[in-house]
């Protein structure tokens, strides 16, 4: 829509969102780059959304972001923070503890901003180094390495209080484009 209107839109509690949360049985909200302007705005938005959902339904919301590390780190980019390394870089290390540490740091970052779910971990097995959208979003082209690293990341997110939404399986594969 902003490409058509020339407008960018930052979601705030004043945009009718809270009325919607108080009226409808919403289970979750996904926030993207256009919903983010400052750390304070994001924290207020997520706090206000949780309060509205709790008041209406008695249970909180899933508040979802997508922070994979590397090139897919919307919040880090918008807020001027440095993201964790990409899955590809971490996978090349062969060290699952580095993956756990990166996922734990991302979980802490997300919780601080009010997110409790992350559209990550990519469990895709890289089919080629080029010609695919996945690229460094995959831990490896080796299924065993991907499984080990994805499980390490998934566990670290859960231990850190963030629900990981594991994606790209059975695989994005060698598809060109999303």
What are these regions (language model features)?
Residues 1-13:
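Boundary/entry segment of secreted carbohydrate-active catalytic domains
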Residues 7, 20-146, 173-178:
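Enzymes and membrane/adaptor proteins characterized by extended Gly/Ser/Thr/Asp/Glu-rich
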Residues 149-150:
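Substrate-gating cap/lid alpha-helix
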Residues 154-170, 176:
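Phosphate/pyrophosphate-binding betaalpha-module
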């Amino acid at each position: 829509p902003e490409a058509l209107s020339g407008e960018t839109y930052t979601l705030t509690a004043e945009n009718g969102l809270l009325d919607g949360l108080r009226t409808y049985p919403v289970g979750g909200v996904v926030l993207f780059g256009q919903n983010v302007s400052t750390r304070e705005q994001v924290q207020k938005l997520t706090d206000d959304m949780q309060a509205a959902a709790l008041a209406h339904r008695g249970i909180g919301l899933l508040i979802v972001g997508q922070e994979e590390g590397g090139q897919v780190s919307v919040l880090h980019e918008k807020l001027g923070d440095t993201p964790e390394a990409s899955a590809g870089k971490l996978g090349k290390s062969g060290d699952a503890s580095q993956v756990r540490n990166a996922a734990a740091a991302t979980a802490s970052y997300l919780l601080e901003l009010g997110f409790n779910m992350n559209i990550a971990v990519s469990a895709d097995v890289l089919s080629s180094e080029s010609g695919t959208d996945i690229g460094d979003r995959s831990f490896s082209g080796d299924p065993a390495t991907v499984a080990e690293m994805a499980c390490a990341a998934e566990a670290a997110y859960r231990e850190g209080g963030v629900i990981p939404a594991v994606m790209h399986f059975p695989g994005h594969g060698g598809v060109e484009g999303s």
